[in-house]
């Protein structure tokens, strides 16, 4: 709408004017400065003044077109276009932020689910182990201290499960808020996500579409330049083309008599006129100072644009580094998990054979639970890093398509 309004400045203005009045016709010689609301009168001076009134009417069509403005209107159009691009870029960036926030909240719930499953598995293993030790202690095959330590580890595992469940509920609340469903309970199914990973080489970004942050900076710079040009043209001459067609009617005659009746209600005398007018604000020093201010604002906008370009490049570099490290960690955690599972089995076997203390079993259980959690989180972190790269590239559509 603002762009269309700016373009309409090129069109001529056409005003229609109608007036009816009833007034006296007394006139005199002399000059009076025009004042607001002070009526004017035309016609010869008649010696005999009269208080009698008569009808008068005016009908006119007035045309004015600014033929030359030294680029002021074109600068206004450029400013409106830049503001339109800024609004569009702001909308795109908001959409990216919402998509990234929603995805991050979803992955947070998935990670919390994985942590809950790992904690629940640890509780089950320690529960079974504690029952076994209880039987051994009852048979006086193990010291009572082992049972106390096993129960302490079981209680610690249950506390970890409670904390994990609380974190999962908080993550669900965050996801519901991003989805616009605050107050509702949100359930997700992330099994397929945990079993997959994004493509090694994601779909290339659309090079024809700039990053919205860079486009925002560019649009603000262009708008500042346009405002500078508008300020420059404010104190330059303006050339107007003028035209008018108008008619007047009156019930007063040249000799001072009155025709009476309805005479004067209809315009009887018509005229036309065309002309050129030049306007030059000779002493408009404020506009010249405004130009200097606009030039400084343009320099500031240019600096912000360059900073935005650098920021986009830096964010993309950091996101790609995150994705690379996340992939390598996800490739390493399965080996860590396999070793932790083997350690847990071996520690349990050594304890059952009387070759290891219960502390070794407890430590193996903690290592296994941590490895199970880290393995799931590592795979989810690859997806999180993939979306960070997509956001840094300015288009999350390719990353979203990989989820489908």
Where are these regions (language model features)?
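Bacterial Sec-pathway N-terminal export signals of envelope proteins
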Residues: 1-20, 25-28, 66-67, 75, ...
């Amino acid at each position: 709408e603002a762009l269309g309004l700016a373009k309409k400045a090129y069109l001529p203005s056409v005003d229609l004017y109608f007036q009816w009045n009833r007034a006296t016709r007394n006139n005199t010689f002399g000059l009076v400065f025009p004042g607001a609301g002070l009526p004017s009168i035309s016609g010869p001076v008649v010696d005999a003044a009269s208080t009698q009134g008569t009808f008068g009417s005016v009908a006119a069509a007035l045309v004015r077109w600014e033929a030359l403005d030294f680029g002021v209107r074109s600068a206004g159009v450029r400013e409106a276009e830049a503001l339109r691009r800024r609004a569009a870029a702001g909308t795109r960036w908001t959409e990216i932020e919402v998509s990234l926030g929603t995805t991050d909240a979803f992955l947070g719930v998935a990670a919390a689910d994985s942590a809950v499953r790992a904690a629940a598995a640890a509780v089950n293993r320690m529960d079974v182990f504690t029952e076994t030790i209880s039987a051994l202690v009852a048979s006086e095959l193990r010291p009572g201290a082992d049972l106390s330590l096993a129960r302490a580890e079981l209680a610690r595992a249950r506390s970890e499960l409670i904390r994990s469940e609380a974190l999962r509920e908080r993550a669900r609340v965050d996801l519901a808020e991003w989805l616009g469903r605050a107050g509702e309970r949100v359930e997700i199914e992330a099994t397929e996500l945990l079993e997959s990973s994004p493509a090694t080489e994601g779909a290339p970004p659309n090079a024809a579409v700039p990053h919205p942050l860079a486009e925002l900076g560019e649009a603000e710079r262009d708008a500042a330049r346009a405002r500078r040009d508008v300020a420059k043209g404010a104190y330059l001459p303006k050339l107007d083309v003028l035209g008018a067609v108008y008619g007047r009617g009156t019930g007063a005659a040249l000799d001072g008599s009155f025709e009476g009746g309805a005479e004067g209600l209809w315009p009887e005398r018509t005229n036309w006129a065309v002309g050129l007018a030049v306007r030059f604000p000779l002493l408009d020093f404020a506009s010249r100072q405004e130009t200097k201010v606009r030039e400084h604002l343009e320099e500031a906008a240019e600096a912000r644009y360059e900073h935005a370009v650098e920021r986009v490049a830096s964010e993309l570099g950091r996101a790609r580094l995150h994705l690379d490290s996340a992939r390598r960690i996800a490739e390493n955690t399965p080996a860590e998990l396999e070793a932790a599972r083997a350690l847990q089995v071996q520690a349990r076997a050594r304890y059952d054979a009387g070759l290891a203390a219960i502390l070794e079993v407890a430590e193996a259980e903690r290592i296994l639970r941590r490895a199970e959690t880290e393995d799931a989180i590592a795979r989810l972190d690859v997806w999180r890093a993939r979306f960070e790269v997509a956001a840094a590239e300015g288009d999350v559509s390719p990353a979203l398509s990989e989820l489908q």
